[in-house]
Amino acid sequence: AQAAVDPPPAYKQIALPKGVPAEVLYSVALTESKVLLRGEYVPWPWTLNVAGKSYYYATRTAACTALLAAINLYGAKSVDSGLGQVNIGWNGHRFSSPCESLDPYKNLDATSDILIEQRDALYASAPGRPVDWIQVAGRYHR
């Protein structure tokens, strides 16, 4: 068994006002964009998934350049971006530009909104039922 991880403050700042458990938001980001840094797995903000392959960049600028190239080469629906690996084709409207998806706070905000939308879709026919956030997270890329 592992001890529960206390999510970093940014996750709480974004998730809690929206009603998303910060642990769920952090778990989604960790699942979607983790890298090994100083012996610990952490979510990495400058992560792209292009046509099913993950790429990690040292800077936001490098990730932005690669993101724009990937969209041009593969199409926006084949590109996921940032901490929550938000799909640019389906969710690009959540950002003012594709590269804005690499802003950690804006990406986590979009990720939280997607989780809320999935929660609402899952529980539309059963209002008042206790929310199973693991089930909601499992619907994240729908």
PLM region spans:
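Catalytic glycan-binding domains that act on GlcNAc-containing polysaccharides
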Residues: A3-R142
